[in-house]
Amino acid sequence: MSELRDLVIDAHGGIARWNKVKTVDGDMSITGGLWARKGWPDALKDVHVTAAAEKQWISYRPFIGEGMRTSCTPDHTIIETLDGKPVKDRRNPRAAFDGHTVETPWDDLHLAYFSGYAMWNYLNTPFIFALPGFQTEEIEPWDENGEKRRRLKVAFPDHIATHCPEQIFHVNDEGLICRVDYSAPVAGGAPTAHYLDDHKDFSGIKMATRRRALRRKADGTAIPDPVFVAIDIAEIRFS
């Protein structure tokens, strides 16, 4: 636990407000070089996402084609019709990435799993930091183009599907997360600097509406091109 963790949660709306949330719905466009490399260019360019706040579950629709959606938990990835009829599924989905490299193409269930766990994390952060099993620690600050930013190191519990067990969250002067450093082994494991901006208030909760994932150099600085993942969120609704 850390003072910075509490500051970040409060800046994004506070735990009392978040505890009233059951689901998060978002309309968004997800593009970038990663998807083409994996064989799915523009597959997530115009999607609606529904994520649970009380458990790790998420659904994309449409998925791949009209009339299809996903239903994903850490242990089970399902592609189904809009009325809930399973079309195909994979249990223990993370194991299906064993032996992959950056260039290994994905099938549709790989795509569903990666995009699912990643977006669930994005939509539930930073509030998940208050859950049992998460460990947080403030570490030395970072200078980003002359701006000094505080940093929060977060260790994730084993039962949460995420990019990697330990991630570094950069915090701006408003207490908002503006960058995350991680690597994602299921997507090749390249060191990543994931930038967040254009934070907006949606019913009392602040979320970044623009995200860009870039390659991170050994000195911690980001390589601006190419953009591996670009996420632009048009609307967020809580229920």
Where are these regions (language model features)?
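Short, solvent-exposed secondary-structure boundary motifs
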Residues: 34-43, 57-64, 120-135, 156-162, ...
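Gly/Pro-enriched, hydrophobic low-complexity segments
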Residues: 146-239
